[in-house]
């Protein structure tokens, strides 16, 4: 299974890139973890936010192909590390690739939310979108380590 993290926004701060890449490189070859960045639409005081969200959403969905889609969204389901590890096994056994979607400043388009089979909430807090990339990468790596009885995760 290949995991794709599809996120709105490019040109992230160096700490975001370094943090994401630290966990990305730890994933096993049989479970590659890829970041796909979708350019954010231009926002200004006269911007048509609905249209921008639709365009970003279309680009995100096009990048998903036939993979299982899971959105990262506050109203989604929160998982403990152990629950995420179980979920990771379910996704792996499904036989499809996995696309995780992170929206831009206004969130995800209605089309992305409708296409998702699941929605995952990292926290009831609103988190900065760049930080979410790092948190997702670490959380997935930790969940993988649980499934492999790797000593990274300690209870």
From Swiss-Prot:
UniProt-listed Enzyme Commission number(s): 2.1.1.177
SUPFAM superfamilies in UniProt? alpha/beta knot
> Looking at the UniProt record for this protein, which Gene Ontology cellular component terms does it annotate, in alphabetical order?
cytoplasm
Record-linked CDD domains? RlmH-like
The protein's enzyme class: transferase
What's a single GO MF annotation on this record? rRNA (pseudouridine-N3-)-methyltransferase activity
**Top-level taxon of the source organism:** Bacteria
Alphabetically sorted, this entry's keywords are: Cytoplasm, Methyltransferase, rRNA processing, S-adenosyl-L-methionine, Transferase
Instruction: Give its localization.
Output: Cytoplasm
Where S-adenosyl-L-methionine binds, per the record, is at 72, 103, 122-127
As its record notes, the protein acts as a catalyst of: pseudouridine(1915) in 23S rRNA + S-adenosyl-L-methionine = N(3)-methylpseudouridine(1915) in 23S rRNA + S-adenosyl-L-homocysteine + H(+)
Please name every pair of cysteines joined by a disulfide bond in this record.
none
Q: How does it assemble?
A: Homodimer.
Protein family (similarity comment)? Belongs to the RNA methyltransferase RlmH family.
The record's annotation in NCBIfam families points to: PRK00103.1-1, PRK00103.1-4, tRNA_RlmH_YbeA
Its annotated function is as follows: Specifically methylates the pseudouridine at position 1915 (m3Psi1915) in 23S rRNA.
Task: Indicate what this protein is called per its UniProt record.
Answer: Ribosomal RNA large subunit methyltransferase H
> In the UniProt record, what gene is named as encoding this protein?
rlmH
């Amino acid at each position: 299974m290949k995991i794709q993290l599809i996120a709105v926004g490019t040109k992230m701060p160096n700490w975001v890139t370094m943090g994401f890449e630290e966990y990305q490189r730890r994933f096993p070859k049989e479970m590659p973890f890829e970041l796909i960045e979708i350019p954010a639409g231009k926002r200004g005081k006269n911007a048509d936010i609905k249209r921008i969200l639709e365009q970003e959403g279309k680009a995100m969905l096009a990048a998903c192909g036939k993979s299982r889609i899971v959105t990262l969204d506050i109203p989604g389901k929160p998982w403990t590390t152990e629950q995420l590890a179980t979920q990771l096994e379910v996704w792996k056994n499904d036989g499809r690739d996995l696309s995780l979607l992170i929206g831009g400043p206004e969130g995800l388009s209605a089309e992305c939310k409708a296409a998702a089979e699941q929605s995952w909430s990292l926290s009831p807090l609103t988190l900065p979108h760049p930080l979410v990339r790092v948190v997702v990468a670490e959380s997935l790596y930790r969940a993988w380590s649980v499934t492999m009885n790797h000593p990274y995760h300690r209870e």
